[in-house]
C-alpha cells in the first residue's frame, strides 16, 4: 500500500467533548472489493431459571455469537474500510447500512482513474471520510495522542498494521490492559495496549457523527461493563491455570 497525505477538517465545537487534541494527520490506505450484506443475526438462545418465589427467563449469548456481535464482517479481502465504516453507522448511529451499499457509493464517488488507483493501492482514510459525508454524516480526520484515546465517548475508525498488512478497525474502548476493537476480519477482539501502540498507524482517527445525533447515547458498539467483567474473569482463570502452586509439607 502507498502512503497518502491527508488533511484533517476543522473539528466542530460540539465534538470537543468527545475528542481532545485532534490535529492534521497522515494515514495509510486500505483496499476494497465486492461485498455482500452481512448475515442476519441468529436469535438468542434462552434458559429458564427457577426458584421457589418466581420464574424468570434469562437470555444467554453463546461463545460463538459474542465475537461477531455488533460487527459488520468484511466479505472480501480488501473491504475492511467499508465494513468498519458500516459497523460505525449501523451499530453506533443506528442506520441499517451494508458494506455493499457503501462500496457502491465509492464507485459513484470516484472517477474511473481514481478507482483503478484505489484497486491497486487501496482506499485511504480520506476516502472513508468523503464516503461518510456522502451518505449523510459529519466526519473529520485527525491525530490523537494515545492518552487521549481513552477519553473518546464514541467509537472511532482507526488504521492499524497487522502482519505487515494495512487494515481498518473500529476502536471501541480500553481498560488498563487491553484495547477493544471491532475488527471486520476477526470480529470483536482485544489487543494488549503495548501491541496496539505498535500497530496504530500514525495515531490517525476518523470521527463520524450523525447530524443532530445524541453524542452521549448508550451505544452497543462501546465496550460494556459485562465485557470488562468477562475479560477480568478470563485473566484470573489464565493466571490461576498458569501459576505454580506450592503446597507446604
Ranges and model annotations:
Residues 29-111, 232-235, 241-249:
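Active-site-adjacent structural segments surrounding the nucleophilic cysteine of cysteine proteases
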Residues 34-36, 40-64, 106-209, 214-218:
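Conserved active-site-adjacent core of cysteine acyl-enzyme catalytic domains
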Residues 1-4, 88, 180:
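Short amphipathic alpha-helical segments with coiled-coil-like heptad repeat character
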Residues 203-249:
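Low-complexity, Gly/Ser/Thr/Pro-rich intrinsically disordered linker/tail segments
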Residues 3-19:
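Bacterial N-terminal signal peptides that target proteins for export
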Residues 17-29:
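Bacterial N-terminal signal peptides
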Amino acid at each position: 500500500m502507498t502512503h497518502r497525505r491527508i488533511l484533517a477538517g476543522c473539528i466542530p465545537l460540539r465534538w470537543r467533548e468527545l475528542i481532545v487534541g485532534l490535529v492534521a494527520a497522515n494515514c495509510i490506505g486500505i483496499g476494497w472489493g465486492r461485498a455482500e450484506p452481512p448475515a442476519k443475526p441468529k436469535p438468542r438462545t434462552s434458559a429458564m431459571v427457577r426458584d421457589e418465589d418466581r420464574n424468570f427467563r434469562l437470555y444467554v449469548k453463546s461463545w460463538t455469537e459474542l465475537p461477531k456481535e455488533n460487527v459488520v464482517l468484511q466479505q472480501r479481502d480488501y473491504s475492511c474500510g467499508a465494513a468498519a465504516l458500516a459497523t460505525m453507522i449501523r451499530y453506533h448511529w443506528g442506520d441499517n447500512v451494508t458494506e455493499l451499499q457503501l462500496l457502491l457509493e465509492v464507485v459513484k464517488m470516484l472517477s474511473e482513474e481514481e478507482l483503478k488507483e484505489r484497486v491497486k493501492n487501496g482506499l485511504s482514510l480520506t476516502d472513508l471520510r468523503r464516503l461518510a459525508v456522502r451518505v449523510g454524516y459529519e466526519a473529520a480526520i485527525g491525530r490523537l495522542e494515545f492518552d487521549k484515546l481513552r477519553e473518546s465517548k464514541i467509537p472511532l475508525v482507526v488504521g492499524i498494521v497487522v502482519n505487515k498488512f494495512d487494515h481498518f478497525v473500529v476502536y471501541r474502548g480500553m481498560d488498563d490492559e487491553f484495547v477493544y476493537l471491532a475488527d471486520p476480519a476477526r470480529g470483536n477482539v482485544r489487543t494488549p495496549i503495548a501491541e496496539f501502540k505498535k500497530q496504530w498507524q500514525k495515531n490517525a482517527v476518523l470521527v463520524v457523527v450523525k447530524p443532530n445525533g445524541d453524542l452521549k447515547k448508550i451505544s452497543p458498539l462501546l465496550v460494556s461493563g459485562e465485557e470488562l467483567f468477562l475479560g477480568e474473569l478470563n485473566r484470573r482463570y489464565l493466571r490461576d491455570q498458569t501459576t505454580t502452586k506450592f503446597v507446604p509439607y
